Every structure is written in structure tokens, then in C-alpha cells.
Amino acid sequence: MRYPGRMTDAPPDPRARYLALRDEVALHNRAYYEQDAPTIPDDEYDRLARELRELEAAHPEFADDHSPVQTVGGAPSSAFEPVTHPTQMTSLDNVFDDDELRDWQEKLARSLGLPLDTDDFTFTGELKIDGLSVNLYYLDGELQWAATRGNGRVGEIVTAQVLTIPDIPQKLEGLKGELEVRGEVYLSRADFAAFNAQAEELGTPLLKNPRNGAAGALRQKDPEVTRTRHLKAILYAVGKRDGVPARTQWEVLEWLSAQGFPTSRSSEHLRGIAAAADYHARMIRAHADFEFDADGTVLKLDSLSQQEEAGFTSRAPRWAIAYKFPVEEVETVLESITVNVGRTGKLAPLAHLSPRLIEGSTVSKATLHNEDYIRDMDLRVGDTVLVRKSGGVIPQIMRVLPDKRPADAAPFEFPTHCPVCGHEAVRAEGDANTYCPNPACPAQSFERIRYFVSRGAMDVRGIGEKLVTQLLHEGLIHDAAGLYTLSAEQLAGLERGGEKKAGNILGQLEASKTKPLWRLINALGMSHVGQRNAQALARAFGTLEGLLAATPEQIEAVPGLGGIIAQSVTASLADPAMRDLIARLQASGVAPQAEEVTRTDQLSGLNFVLTGALSRPREVIKAELEAAGGRVTGSVTKKTSYLVAGEDAGSKLARAGELGVPVLDEAGLAALLAERGLGERGVAEDGMSGAETEAAPAES
């Protein structure tokens, strides 16, 4: 089945349609490549671009070198220094089904003078990551600059911004001549969700998708702002390749990995077009579990000599093709809109949808963000809407189908008062969010207490939604500090388990008083401060008193934070209500463990890689190693000193065996640290088992 174009809808005058379509595609190109603000979904753009190519194929007299489907990328930004790529950075042509994939192979065979039905091709299969393309230029092994793709010939220098990304080598030993390393900079789905959660709290603009986030972060003039976005990269190609001992694309990937560049674990070596189609089908099934957004696979002819022989069109290689994932959009009905109140007082609208199965799971709700979002989409109860999973995970309403709107559907009236306490709601000028300003609002108290005892904060077991509701309803507590004043008698009167259950809860509360400092910092619920930033603050200041005394400048200087977070933390800790809460927590005996601030150099010169399911969060282990002078990278190379492997370690373990890199389990790491005078570090910080400390997922 062919991918649907729009040729059947074309007007009688093909030139008029061509000119209109050319302008439309060019407009979308500028929005996507130059403004990082796409105006339509990728699949809609693909349909428009395909129709334009079909018109140019049918009417060659229409096309010229300035056609938006014959050029690459967009104009470089004047805000950054331009640089000419030694070899052009191209785009990729697309296919959308197995028939088109076989057609592409026939064209490839024809360009190489081979039989059209040949099945002798070997391919590499790679994921098509939805990020921003970059080019890293090395001369005699030294990184000279990093640049965006730009228009394919001239890009924008973003070296300082790229160097905030983990594992980008600045020096390659023993390499002479010129080398270009190409890849994709991306924002992980988890960091995308965290950014938007903070943006919703602050009322600042949301990112439309992770690709937008990556592009915007990489184009920040201040690299410290880029650092706070936690960008990552996957490198997958070379342009100029002096000194690279590779005859195939697969050998290029292996060489990049050996040099320490981050590469994809999902790439595969494939024999024949049937294997390529099977790889694509497997990636479709797996793509909801990827760390990053991917909108397809890329299939490349493996032989570099055959690549050179096949050559390029004006915009794309003939020897590679992007096989796009199908986009599943489902029609459903917007049954109702409710407005909830979060712990910051934000009024958060939620869409309730007729349940539909999308990509293997039932979807019945979707976030609507704020009043402007509802108004801009003109969403009305009763509307038929198209829903997809953003990034394969988060349900998102894409658009309304106005021709199916009921006659009596009225615009949604956003509440002017808090739906819980009735207090008049407020919306500051320039803020996208509406808030309940009542600090005593039961909904806010409920959410703040739930967050305080949650697993990523103080981790107090046994205090669930029902108990928090009862405690607030009975007037036994008003905030988190009140939890530490509860008696066994009060709890026994509420809990079905009576005295035994009450005793367990009081024991959990008592144990939480001396948990690590970062847990309390996170539990306070400050804007922009989640688990990772709480750990950074704890490491930087050591004690709660140290953090309370810190200046905005000192907080801003903490690696990975920056000015916006510093302002938010300073304002939160200066708030009288926050100071009162902290004082009452301390009066109740909450005295978190101090963090070790002093850096040492016992591990100086050692490079570590972490892999597999570890009993403690990987970020915690990484912080310990770096605090002692070690370096933690993401790829096993000949420079790696130790691979620390948990359960279900994958390809990194095999790679360590190939290179002769020593492998340590967690007991071995603890022994190494003890030998170096760093004490016993093999037990979780708060004495919990791995299952209770949010163990890091397996990573191959």
C-alpha cells in the first residue's frame, strides 16, 4: 500500500497547485529549521513534501535548485558564527512501506549496475533520532569546532554548547588529518517531561516536543543554560575521515564507539532487504520504550566503496533511506474537562476522552495544560478530536474535527474561582497559568503532603492518598510538618490496621528524620527542584543550614543549575511560609544526614562506565566517583579503567571483554573504593535495598 499523497485533491491547473504547495512547504521549512517551531505534525509535512516531489517529477519544467524539497535545512542563524562544512551535510529521502523500500533497493541496484532483484546488499540499520544534526570537526585529533547542519553547506558554530553534552571527546589520540563526526543532539523523553512540568509550574512556554527542546537548548547563547537542559547525543557517521580504518558503515560505528563517542545500542548489521524490513518492524514495536523520540529507521548501504559509487542527489545520498514509522492517530470524543489544583495552586485542566486503544494501551485522559491551550485549539465538550501518543508515551490531542462538532457545543469557560476552596483565582500578566492563591486550599495541602512523603522525596511508606485525605479532613494536620506531631492514638483511630499499622507509620516517620539531605530538599517542593537538582544542591552545600545561607550567586555556580533555578530556590527559601515549615520540621527532630562536600583526588585519572541494573541510582554512584576525582563516561573504550556492571549488563560487558577492560560488580567497586581510602560505599545511602532506591534500569 502506497503512502497517501494529495494528488487526488490537486486542482486542474498543476502549476497553480505546484506554486501554492511550494510556498507552503518553504514556510514549514523555515518554521522547522530556522525557528525551531514546527507548525504542523511531521506526517502532514511528509505528505506535502511528497506531493511536491511528485509534481516536480511529473513536470520537470516546474523545478529549480531553490525548490524546498531539493535543498537541505534552513539558513544559518545570524546570532552564531557561520562555518563551512568541509563536506556537505545532506538530508535523507523517505519511504513509508515495504513496497517502497524494495523500490528503493531496485534504484540502488540500478545505480550500481547490479541486477534489480539482487539480495546481496548488506545494510546497517539505525534509529532516526528526532533531534538536531551536528558536525564535529577534528584536526590532528583536536576538536576545532562543533556546528549545526544549517543549510547543509554552512552551519552555526555551537562548540561551547556541544561540550556540555556528556562523552563528547575533545581529543582523539594518534589521529592525523581531518575528521568530521556527525550525529544527532537530543533531549530525552524524561528530561522533556521534567522541563515541561517545571514550565507549567512557572507559567512559561511549554516545549512542543523533544526536538524543539534540543534545538532551542543548543542555540542558547549561554552554554550554562544549555547545560541545565541535560542534552545528549548519538554519533553515527563521518564526513572527512582521514585516518579512520573503516571499509564499512558498521566499522565506522564500531570505531566511533571505541574512540569514546556515544553511539546507539539499537543499530544492527543486516543482510538483505528482508532483514532490513524485519529490523524496521521490530523497531516499530520497541519505539515506545526508547529513551528518545525516533520517527523511523535509517537503512544505509554498508560498503563505503559502494556508497561512493552510488553517490548523491542534490539533497540526499542514494545509498541511504529513512523508513518512517507509521503515526497512529485515533478519533475519540472529548466527554468532559475537569480542572484540578496542584501543590503550587496551579489550576490544571484535564481532558476526559472516550476510551480508545492507541499503540497497545487504552487512552482515556489527556492534559490540556492551561486556559490558553484550550482556547487556541477551540476545544469544546462533545468535540471529536484526533489523539496520538507524544513520543510514543504521553496522550496528546492533536486537533479538533470541526465538521463533526455537535450543534450545541459551547466554548469551555475556564473557572474564575478555585474549584476546591472557592477562592478567586489569579493569573499574572504574561503568565500562561491560573492559580489559586489561597495557601490553606485543601487541594494544595493534599498535593504538597503527598509529594513530601513520595518515593522520590522522604519516602515514607504507609501514608497514601486516603490517609492524607482523612488527616486533613479531621484537622489533625495542615502541612507536612504536622505529620511528625501525630500520635499512635490519632493514627489508630483512622487506620484499619489499628495500633500495629499506626506503629509502622510512626516508625517510618521517625526513620525519615535522618534520611539524606537531598530527600528533604526535594520534599520541600521548590519549583525547578526535582531529585537530580536536589542532589546537586546537597552535594554543593552539605547541610540544610548551608543551603539556607547560600547566596543566589553561590547556587547559580552549582554545576548543572544556573540563574533561573538559583532565583527560584532563593525565592522559595526566603518565603516566610517555607521558613516556618522548615523550622517546625527541625523542631520535630528532622535532621537530615549531612553530605560530603569536600572533593578528593583518590580516583584521579580513572575512567568508569556504569551498566546494567544497579542497586542504587546511577546518578548517585556517578556523583560519588566524580567527587573522588574519577570520570564517568557512557561508552566502553580502550581508555576505560573499569566497567561497573550490574545485572542484565549487555553489549558494554561484551565490549569490555574485547578490549580487556576490568569489570567490577558492586562489591568489587566497594573494595576498590576502600583500597583508595574512600570507605565502604557499597550499601544504599539510606539503608534500603536496590528495589526501594529506584534502581537504575538496565543499560547495554
Swiss-Prot record:
NAD(+) binds at residues 42-46, 91-92, 126, 149, 184, 300, 324. GO terms for biological process: DNA repair; DNA replication. Its EC number is 6.5.1.2. Zn(2+) binds at residues 418, 421, 436, 441. Belongs to the NAD-dependent DNA ligase family. LigA subfamily. DNA ligase that catalyzes the formation of phosphodiester linkages between 5'-phosphoryl and 3'-hydroxyl groups in double-stranded DNA using NAD as a coenzyme and as the energy source for the reaction. It is essential for DNA replication and repair of damaged DNA. NCBIfam families: dnlj (TIGR00575), PRK07956.1 (NF005932). This is DNA ligase. The gene is ligA.
